[in-house]
Amino acid sequence: MNSKTPTLGIVCSEGTISLSLEEGFEFVGVPLSGEGLKLRVEALAPSERLQEFLDDEVAYHPEENVHKVVGLSSAWLELDSEDTLIADRSEEVLLKEASYASYCGLSSIILNGPTSPMNVMRYARAVSSALNSTMNLKFLVQLAIESGHEDYFETWKMWDTIRSACGYHPRLKVALELPPACSPPIELVNRWYAEPIEMITMSCMAFVPNPNGYPVLGRKLRAIYALYLRLNPRILLWDNDAPEKIGDSPDYSIYMKHLFDSQPPAPLVEDLADSYKDYLQVPLQPLSYNLENITYEIFERDPVKYAQYEQAIFSALMDRDESSVTRIAVVGAGRGPLVDCALRAAISSSRTVDMIALEKNPNAFSMLLMRNRQDWAGKVTLVFGDMRTWNPDYKIDILVSELLGSMGDNELSPECLDGVQHVLDEETGICIPSSYISYVTPIMSPKLWSEARNMNDPNAFERQYVVLMNSFDFLAADDEFRFQSLWSFHHPNKDSEVYTKNLHNKRFASVRFQASSPGILHGFAGYFEATLYKDISLSIMPATMEAKSPDMFSWFPIYMPIKKPMYVPENSQLEFHMWRLTDGMRVWFEWCANAYLVLRNGSQIKLSSTEVHNISGKAFSCNMY
């Protein structure tokens, strides 16, 4: 787990705020109004307006712990009532309570969710009105993780309607309730994981006494709770009489924190890059910009990647004649980590090597000069310049590079290696890596889509982003077809065609995915697999990364958004088209998607389509020079 421990709170009255905090809870949920308000509202004539709160109707007053208080909207409100008067009165009260919560300085207010799908749009409009009536207040819609009906996704569908009607408002969040007897399918658990869960709410009755009388969660609830802890939500307990039945109030706090501490460690990439979760970054353009020292430093922290490279070079050396001298060139050497790998591999393989390092970044080249003097005893031949214009009077046996982007080719590795392969020995020369494949899968991520929208840039949805994805869910069925390959590149390129304007590196792919449960398409995630040498590989593709290169963190996936979220019904199909295009001076990617409902007779009905994104590279392209 990451270092953030869960924040635990409990529902209480205004008079017991201090006691609850003293018992170990870090925040409290407090009703904003009392029964008196309900009685007055019920007594109002249809033509009367609700005036300001009366003294006996206010259940909370600002005090020193206001920063530890979450407001609870009145439980009796019926924003989705079929009775227009009741719905209107409920909205009046909500607006009053929201205004009062803002006045008190509260950061958030919890609303009970809609009671059924029938009038959810009425509920959504009222919430939208409340959101727009305040400046900073967060609105947390409390919804059970499952509906309890035949359609497990009913509650999630209601939330999606509310969220969409409110325009993905940044202050609209979920307070997800985990009922005592809930048993949602894993698809639903994962779907909620992608949503903006600000808080987990649980009844104290969800706990059962262990043999020592202390409150614990059952196995299923414990597993769900453990998963959602990765989102760092606050935990709110309610049912104030339950502590008398199972232990004391502090026992809940102790147990919940014990659950956190007993979780298995988070993947290394999450531990090292926690601050990068769901943070959109534009991919590097190493051909047109010189990387900074900190960028090299971050790349060099990945022991897995360099261990794989070293093993690949070692294996390649072992396959060569023991008495020969092998000429190895590291192109794009940066600060020299691959040079270190090659020199170590030469020692462990007992092979003699002639080592060359080429780098075009003058700042990094100065580091290579220093390292050659201090670390390599002058054994490395250093070359300054662009690898594509390098013309040595000798041939290279092993050409080593680390030019891969998050989808393999997206940082122009093909263009670079095509441009330098003329230095390879035509008979025995090899490249490390020797090939790489790009993969893609459809994802649902309100968080990532909102991050792109919040850039307030008209081109934001037509760019690719590098991102450590956390708040997302896969839309494709969990089978062998969840991740589809788009295209591959092989080096050296054996095609004897004369390369003109880089046209041989154009690509097009069209792939389909099956959606087994309802969701919202917010874009596509891109990955790669690379073969370094023979069976030695690198992968950031989720289906193979654990087997090929576990705990590698040099690359985050690519996120390709779509301009407008697309609803994807259960058992529908998503079709994805992608182009890799070039004009000889730059390379860019274009993409679009279609959704289909496939009927039993094999025919299909188109549900929706997107436009082609980044047409002609208008929003983003990679410069070749």
Swiss-Prot record:
<dbReference type="GO" id="GO:0032259">
    <property type="term" value="P:methylation"/>
</dbReference>
<dbReference type="GO" id="GO:1903360">
    <property type="term" value="P:protein localization to lateral cortical node"/>
</dbReference>
<feature type="binding site">
    <location>
        <position position="296"/>
    </location>
    <ligand>
        <name>S-adenosyl-L-methionine</name>
    </ligand>
</feature>
<dbReference type="InterPro" id="IPR035075">
    <property type="entry name" value="PRMT5"/>
</dbReference>
<dbReference type="GO" id="GO:1903359">
    <property type="term" value="P:lateral cortical node assembly"/>
</dbReference>
<protein>
    <recommendedName>
        <fullName>Protein arginine N-methyltransferase skb1</fullName>
        <ecNumber>2.1.1.-</ecNumber>
    </recommendedName>
</protein>
<feature type="site" description="Critical for specifying symmetric addition of methyl groups">
    <location>
        <position position="299"/>
    </location>
</feature>
<comment type="subunit">
    <text>Interacts with the N-terminal regulatory domain of shk1. Shk1, cdc42 and skb1 are able to form a ternary complex in vivo. Interacts with orb6. Interacts with Cdr1 and the Cdr1 inhibitory target Wee1.</text>
</comment>
<dbReference type="GO" id="GO:0005829">
    <property type="term" value="C:cytosol"/>
</dbReference>
<dbReference type="InterPro" id="IPR029063">
    <property type="entry name" value="SAM-dependent_MTases_sf"/>
</dbReference>
<dbReference type="InterPro" id="IPR025799">
    <property type="entry name" value="Arg_MeTrfase"/>
</dbReference>
<dbReference type="GO" id="GO:0061246">
    <property type="term" value="P:establishment or maintenance of bipolar cell polarity regulating cell shape"/>
</dbReference>
<keyword id="KW-0808">Transferase</keyword>
<dbReference type="InterPro" id="IPR035247">
    <property type="entry name" value="PRMT5_TIM"/>
</dbReference>
<dbReference type="GO" id="GO:0005938">
    <property type="term" value="C:cell cortex"/>
</dbReference>
<dbReference type="GO" id="GO:0051286">
    <property type="term" value="C:cell tip"/>
</dbReference>
<dbReference type="GO" id="GO:0005634">
    <property type="term" value="C:nucleus"/>
</dbReference>
<dbReference type="GO" id="GO:0030428">
    <property type="term" value="C:cell septum"/>
</dbReference>
<dbReference type="Pfam" id="PF17285">
    <property type="entry name" value="PRMT5_TIM"/>
</dbReference>
<keyword id="KW-0489">Methyltransferase</keyword>
<dbReference type="GO" id="GO:1990463">
    <property type="term" value="C:lateral cortical node"/>
</dbReference>
<keyword id="KW-0949">S-adenosyl-L-methionine</keyword>
<dbReference type="InterPro" id="IPR035248">
    <property type="entry name" value="PRMT5_C"/>
</dbReference>
<dbReference type="GO" id="GO:0071521">
    <property type="term" value="C:Cdc42 GTPase complex"/>
</dbReference>
<dbReference type="GO" id="GO:0071470">
    <property type="term" value="P:cellular response to osmotic stress"/>
</dbReference>
<feature type="domain" description="SAM-dependent MTase PRMT-type">
    <location>
        <begin position="280"/>
        <end position="588"/>
    </location>
</feature>
<dbReference type="GO" id="GO:0016274">
    <property type="term" value="F:protein-arginine N-methyltransferase activity"/>
</dbReference>
<keyword id="KW-0963">Cytoplasm</keyword>
<feature type="active site" description="Proton donor/acceptor">
    <location>
        <position position="411"/>
    </location>
</feature>
<comment type="similarity">
    <text>Belongs to the class I-like SAM-binding methyltransferase superfamily. Protein arginine N-methyltransferase family.</text>
</comment>
<feature type="binding site">
    <location>
        <position position="359"/>
    </location>
    <ligand>
        <name>S-adenosyl-L-methionine</name>
    </ligand>
</feature>
<dbReference type="Pfam" id="PF17286">
    <property type="entry name" value="PRMT5_C"/>
</dbReference>
<feature type="active site" description="Proton donor/acceptor">
    <location>
        <position position="402"/>
    </location>
</feature>
<dbReference type="GO" id="GO:0006355">
    <property type="term" value="P:regulation of DNA-templated transcription"/>
</dbReference>
<keyword id="KW-0539">Nucleus</keyword>
<feature type="binding site">
    <location>
        <begin position="386"/>
        <end position="387"/>
    </location>
    <ligand>
        <name>S-adenosyl-L-methionine</name>
    </ligand>
</feature>
<dbReference type="InterPro" id="IPR007857">
    <property type="entry name" value="Arg_MeTrfase_PRMT5"/>
</dbReference>
<dbReference type="Pfam" id="PF05185">
    <property type="entry name" value="PRMT5"/>
</dbReference>
<comment type="function">
    <text>S-adenosyl-L-methionine-dependent protein-arginine N-methyltransferase that can catalyze both the mono- and symmetric (type II) dimethylation of the guanidino nitrogens of arginine residues in target proteins. Delays mitotic entry by inhibiting the Cdr1-Wee1 signaling pathway. Cortical nodes sequester Skb1 from its regulatory targets Cdr1 and Wee1. Positively modulates the shk1 kinase function. May be a mediator of hyperosmotic stress response. Involved in the control of cell polarity by regulating the subcellular localization of Orb6 kinase.</text>
</comment>
<feature type="binding site">
    <location>
        <begin position="305"/>
        <end position="306"/>
    </location>
    <ligand>
        <name>S-adenosyl-L-methionine</name>
    </ligand>
</feature>
<dbReference type="GO" id="GO:2000100">
    <property type="term" value="P:regulation of establishment or maintenance of bipolar cell polarity regulating cell shape"/>
</dbReference>
<dbReference type="GO" id="GO:0008469">
    <property type="term" value="F:histone arginine N-methyltransferase activity"/>
</dbReference>
